[in-house]
């Protein structure tokens, strides 16, 4: 039974989607005014893992992640650099999409705000017509928070003194009302509307795009904890006010923040790490493994030490799979299982049960990865020592199953056992030559071959009279 933590109820709840067999997910994407950084990746990878696990569980999942391509930050950056705002958007959208591809984050729909202006205007007009919003003298439109009695429950801010919105304007009825539509200012991009030229406020866009692609009620709304207030609180208010659906979102899920040396990663502290810079030092799949194997709600520490550990873990995983592929060339189907083989097989099944039990517990990827490493240990300690057809193929299938969630290994694991690539044949030949050198007691040259292969990322494993190789470089 899958249970998830709901920010709204502040408790674990049994996961039951709105529509049986189908899961709808909306994740707040980036405002594209700067390079994507590792803090963004924390959220995107976490929800990619969640989505992949739900698919593994048999759900039909639709994952929407928006792109905010009009915002104060974009306008300010364009003004500071003397560029057209659309150039800023194009540059950083490209960077964002390239980062997702390298991290193997799979998104079904990437809606952009500027492609949904007519829908946003329609949404705002309906809020005005229903008495939940008002037009100010400037032509800006604000949501009247007092018309939504449940405001503050998502964030736990039940005192009105805690509601003050970032943008205070004397034309608002209350300081905590928030902008749905911003009246045009000189030199800024704008669109025509019934209230005059202007552009959308920040919060309205996600309500509009999520409802367009997922419906008036959907399952999971995700983002970082920094978005709970005011962004998600405001989204919830305007959507439930208009649709009358409660809850509008069934499960609110939020990722923990990243820290650097105990401090929050933020632009104000100048400790942001752009992904494009990080990828120069680490394989993007090392970064993915680090992020994918942490519980999504934990506060995550960023350091070279944790990335080096992830690199080592990825090397060990890749090595285990490569070892299994090599072993698959040696083994043949057998008859009756030995007691020893049955015991190892049961340990593999235990690892599988632990993987699912962890993921069913609020997507505890940390616990699930411990099960993956348990299987990895079995491959090195048991299967490689006494390989059999059943154990080798079962282990490969389990890695393929786990990788459907982790997404860090080759996609062709299950079929890879039968493949023999030219590099495999070359390494097999080198190992064979080294074995003959050892038979001739030419240990100096045999050790030289081992040392050179190791420097190239190939580890040799001497087990009795048999030597096998694995790739270790990540």
UniProtKB/Swiss-Prot annotation:
Gene3D superfamilies reported for this sequence: Cysteine-tRNA ligase, C-terminal anti-codon recognition domain, HUPs
Localization in the cell: Cytoplasm
InterPro entries: Cys-tRNA-ligase, Cys-tRNA-synt_Ia_DALR, Cys-tRNA/MSH_ligase, Rossmann-like_a/b/a_fold, tRNA-synt_1_cat_dom, tRNAsynth_Ia_anticodon-bd
Residues involved in ATP binding: 267
Transmembrane portions of the chain: none
Family: Belongs to the class-I aminoacyl-tRNA synthetase family.
Name of the protein described by the UniProt record: Cysteine--tRNA ligase
Top-level taxonomy: Archaea, Thermoproteota, Thermoprotei, Thermofilales, Thermofilaceae
């Amino acid at each position: 039974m899958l249970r998830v933590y709901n920010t709204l109820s502040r408790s674990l709840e049994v996961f039951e989607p709105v529509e049986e067999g189908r899961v709808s997910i909306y994740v707040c994407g980036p405002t594209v005014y700067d390079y994507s950084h590792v803090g963004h990746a924390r959220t995107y990878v976490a929800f990619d893992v969640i989505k992949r696990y739900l698919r593994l569980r048999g759900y039909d999942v639709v994952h929407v992640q928006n792109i905010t391509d009009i915002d104060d930050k974009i306008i300010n950056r364009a003004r500071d650099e003397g560029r057209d705002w659309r150039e800023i958007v194009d540059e950083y959208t490209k960077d964002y999409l390239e980062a997702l591809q390298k991290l193997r984050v799979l998104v079904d729909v990437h809606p952009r705000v500027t492609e949904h202006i007519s829908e946003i205007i329609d949404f705002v007009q309906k809020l005005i017509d229903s008495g939940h919003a008002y037009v100010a003298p400037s032509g800006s439109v604000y949501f009247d928070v007092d018309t939504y009695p449940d405001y503050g429950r998502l964030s736990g801010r039940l005192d009105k003194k805690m509601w003050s919105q970032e943008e205070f304007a004397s034309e608002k009825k209350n300081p905590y009302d928030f902008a749905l539509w911003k009246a045009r200012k000189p030199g800024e991009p704008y669109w025509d509307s019934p209230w005059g030229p202007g552009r959308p406020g920040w919060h309205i866009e996600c309500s509009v795009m999520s409802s367009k692609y997922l419906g008036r009620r959907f399952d999971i709304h995700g983002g970082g904890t920094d978005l709970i207030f005011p962004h998600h609180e405001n989204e919830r208010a305007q959507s439930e006010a208009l649709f009358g659906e409660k809850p509008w979102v069934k499960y609110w899920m939020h990722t923990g923040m990243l820290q650097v040396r105990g401090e929050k990663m933020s632009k104000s502290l100048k400790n942001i790490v752009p992904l494009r810079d990080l990828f120069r030092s680490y394989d993007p799949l090392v970064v993915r493994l680090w992020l994918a194997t942490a519980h999504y709600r934990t506060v995550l520490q960023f350091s070279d030490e944790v990335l080096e550990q992830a690199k080592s873990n990825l090397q060990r995983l890749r090595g285990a799979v490569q070892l299994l592929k090599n072993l698959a060339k040696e083994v043949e189907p057998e008859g009756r299982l030995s007691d020893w083989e049955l015991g190892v097989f049961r340990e593999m099944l235990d690892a599988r049960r632990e993987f699912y039990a962890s993921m069913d517990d609020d997507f505890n990827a940390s616990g699930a990865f411990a099960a993956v490493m348990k299987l990895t240990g079995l491959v090195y300690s048991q299967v490689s020592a006494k390989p059999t057809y059943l154990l080798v193929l079962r282990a490969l299938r389990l890695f393929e199953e786990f990788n459907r969630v982790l997404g860090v290994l080759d996609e062709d694991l299950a079929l890879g056992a039968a493949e023999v690539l030219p590099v495999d044949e070359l390494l097999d030949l080198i190992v064979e030559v080294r074995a003959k050198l050892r038979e001739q007691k030419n240990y100096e040259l045999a050790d030289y071959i081992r040392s050179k292969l190791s420097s190239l990322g190939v580890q040799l494993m001497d087990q009795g009279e048999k030597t096998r190789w694995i790739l270790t470089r990540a």
